[in-house]
């Protein structure tokens, strides 16, 4: 799927300014450039374009609130100076698996004053002598390179993940979840009540039918008893009648 079409689907009837996270992994970029993404995505904090065939990010729109950018598994070899201009608040940048060969290519990242984490796995630059020491020297604001700090201590999960929602947003999500859960619970209770009422009604109908059937049986028994009484009375009268004839 082409990138601009993917963005349209990801919007899900929202406006670009409502979107804080946008994942475009594995879609197709025509001519190796970002397409369909505009500066209308002014609230965007997380953008992922993994394996989309990018060769350049020169047309990246202005994204002032972007905190984390995933650009791994592409064919980017330069143009990184655009990041400081378009994404001044970027904290986490993943360039793993791109065509970055030397330190001069990443030197423009010095202007990203808030850059905290940088990943360059599977880039040729990692084969240089004293690669880690030189990157930390070139980019003193960076705390974690390829998931480890200057002392080779692994970054905490929160720093590796990079994108963490604010507490207020988490509270809002929890409130929405609680409201939804309560709504589902109320609906289940209503369904149970309706089922109980249906069972009561069906039980009353069964009792009525049983009562009706019992009534029919009682009527039949009464008729049989009446018939037996008539038969016995006839038998009693017959001998009397014979006696009268003899007289």
UniProtKB/Swiss-Prot annotation:
Phosphorylated on serine residues, at least in part by casein kinase 2/CK2. Some glutamate residues are glycylated by TTLL8. This modification occurs exclusively on glutamate residues and results in a glycine chain on the gamma-carboxyl group. Pfam families: LRR_9. InterPro entries: AN32 (IPR045081), Leu-rich_rpt (IPR001611), LRR_dom_sf (IPR032675). Residues 150-172 are annotated as: Necessary for tumor-suppressive function. Signal peptide: none annotated. The modification Phosphoserine is found at residues 17, 158, 202. Predominantly expressed in the cerebellum. Expressed also in cortex, lung, skeletal muscle, gastrointestinal tract, spleen, liver and heart. Keywords: Cytoplasm, Endoplasmic reticulum, Leucine-rich repeat, Nucleus, Phosphoprotein, Repeat, Repressor, Transcription, Transcription regulation. Residues 157-230 have a biased composition (Acidic residues). The keyword DNA repair does not apply. The modification Phosphothreonine is found at residue 15. LRR repeats lie at residues 18-38, 43-64, 65-87, 89-110. GO terms for cellular component: cytoplasm; endoplasmic reticulum; nuclear matrix; nucleus; perinuclear region of cytoplasm. Residues 123-161 form the LRRCT domain. It is found in: Nucleus; Cytoplasm; Endoplasmic reticulum. Residues 150-247 are annotated as: Disordered. Disruption phenotype: Mice are viable and fertile. They have no derangements in any of the major organ systems, including the nervous systems. Moreover, bone marrow cells from mutant mice only show mild decrease of colony-forming unit(CFU)-myeloid. Residues 165-247 are annotated as: Interaction with E4F1. Component of the SET complex, composed of at least ANP32A, APEX1, HMGB2, NME1, SET and TREX1. Directly interacts with SET. Interacts with ATXN1/SCA1. Interacts with MAP1B. Interacts with ELAVL1. Part of the INHAT (inhibitor of histone acetyltransferases) complex. Interacts with E4F1. Belongs to the ANP32 family. Multifunctional protein that is involved in the regulation of many processes including tumor suppression, apoptosis, cell cycle progression or transcription. Promotes apoptosis by favouring the activation of caspase-9/CASP9 and allowing apoptosome formation. In addition, plays a role in the modulation of histone acetylation and transcription as part of the INHAT (inhibitor of histone acetyltransferases) complex. Inhibits the histone-acetyltranferase activity of EP300/CREBBP (CREB-binding protein) and EP300/CREBBP-associated factor by histone masking. This is Acidic leucine-rich nuclear phosphoprotein 32 family member A. It comes from Mus musculus. The lineage of its organism: Eukaryota, Metazoa, Chordata, Craniata, Vertebrata.
